Structure formats: C-alpha cells, structure tokens
Amino acid sequence: MSIKPNSFVIAEASKCVGCKACEIACFRAHSNGVKKPLTVGNIKTPIIPRIHVIKNEKFSVPVQCRQCEDAPCANACPIEAIKQEDNVMVVNEKACIGCKACVMACPFGAIEVRSESEDKPKIAYKCDLCKGQETQACVKICPKKALRLFDPIEEKKRRSIEAVCNLPEEF
C-alpha cells in the first residue's frame, strides 16, 4: 500500500463533446511501438482503448480508472494480476486469465476484458495513466480540455493556499 494517494484522470462532463479522440489517442499510446500512422485502412487489430466515452442525448463523458489505492479490481483478482506500481494500478497482461472478477468488482465500470484477436486470450484492460510515457495521451489530445490529471496531493496544496489567501484580514 502506498502512502501517497494515486493520481488519476478526471473528466468534466460539461466540456466533453463526445468526439472520442481520447479513445483513439489511448489506443495509439498502447499500440506497442507501432511507428506508422494509424488510419482506418491500416489497423489490423480491434481498437481497444483504456478509456470509454459514454454518450447519450443529454451528455457525454469519458469513464476511466480512478487508480484506487485499495483497488477493488486488484482485491478481486484471484491471481493478483493487478498491482500498484509507482502509484498506478496496472494489469500484468501476461498473468491475466480473463476471469472478469475485476470487471465485476470495479465500481466505476472502468475495466474491460477483451481479446486483440480470435487467436489470443481475453485479458483485462484498464487505464494505466500511459505508464512510461511523458503525459497521458487522452489529456493531451482532448480538444475541449475536458480531461485532466488529478493529483490529490497537489489539489490539497492548491486548496490550502486558496484558503489562506481568502482569510479575513482580522485573522
């Protein structure tokens, strides 16, 4: 268990237009070193993003992993394939058996079990904050800036500074 709370990507539904650019950017960021540009004509595998945009007539909002410190998905995994590494909950895709226990345990609906192709086993996919990359692809690509990385420690510092700055002068 980590002492520092995990950061996670948060969405502002009022800004999201449902364009799904975040889904494509996520897929691209996790396409294991593909160098050529990905277009409709050259993608051979299913697009499996680790963020999902829910859209209806009234709103659209991306849903992604909240990087829970005491993660229900990790606690439910019978083989411990979901672990915390450097304050990020990650799936060991080589160990995952595709049992879907994590899917049922996630209160946010942010984990999914799929296969890249019919000849490959089904495994769990979830946001890993683009682990090993400089920035989160979904945050970087969002045209309306509806997504941002939420760091609980930085947010607490920001709110503390705001509170001190807004103290009455007689204090």
Residue ranges and their predicted role:
Residues 10-12:
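Short amphipathic
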Residues 15-17, 133:
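Residues that cap or initiate secondary-structure elements
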Residues 83-91:
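Mid-length scaffold segments of soluble, non-membrane domains
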Residues 21, 83, 112:
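Short, flexible micro-motifs
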Residues 17, 21-28:
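N-terminal signal-anchor transmembrane alpha helix
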Residues 1-6, 32-75, 93-171:
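Flanking helices and flexible, charged tails adjoining ferredoxin-like Fe-S electron-transfer domains
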